[in-house]
Amino acid sequence: MSSFLDTRISRRHLMAAAGTSLLASGIPALAKTPPPSDVGRKFLRSRRPMPFAGNTFVGHLEQQGDGYDSFDRVLNIYRELPEQRFANRFALLPPSSYHVTLLGGVNESDRAHGPWPSDLTRDHALADINADYLSRVKARAAPPLGACRFLVNPTAAKTGANDNLLIPLKPADTQTAQRLEAARQSLMTLTRLQRPEYTNFQFHISLAYLCDTLDAAEQTAYRTAVRGWLTQLAAAGPITVPRFHFCTFDDMYAFRTLHEV
């Protein structure tokens, strides 16, 4: 006849065996969702911008004159976002920084292992790289790219739980696409830099960086809001970027224009 102690031990063994069986059956363990990719790189979770020095080639949206109407339409997102249920997850960019990137350049954060100019050592000071690039840009024989028209492309929107808020764009016509690609290829040669995003590049305007992962309800609301915003912008017509510049920056809030490209 089994003793009380034997019964307790047997039950303990059975529970342990059952736990082992559940683990072996492939029931997934709860995994912590990684934070958005730019947290700890460009922004803190508190939504404060981090130091993120570098250089780039961008075209800012024109805020006055012929560009006022399209800029004002983009600002509708800036106006409406604070009332959204997901708003506190995002770090809003100042409208003065709104731009379309033509070609990304060198970032200080890439110094250790990221993309770097093939003709420069990784201990080359960023200030010297900026000066070198500026000298090369000024010496180019090619005329400036000039104004480029873009169409808002709602079908390219990404509204996942860790996706930043941006306006996806595409060149308004074949001629504009060819001009943009020729300029990009020329600048790739100038910088002697190859970045992963150079291939299949998606033109866009960044509006806000996600600083915390969206939950399911927030993601649904985010997807719905972005779809509405982009549909309205697309229906309003092209967005024209009047000119592009070589720029330097210390963080994602402001870009110093140095020379038109």
Label each residue range with its predicted role.
Residues 14-15, 100:
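An N-terminally biased module of ancient metal coordination in phosphate/nucleic-acid-related enzymes
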Residues 32-261:
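Histidine-dependent nucleotide/RNA phosphoesterase domain, centered on the 2H-phosphoesterase fold
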Residues 11-14, 184:
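Basic side chains
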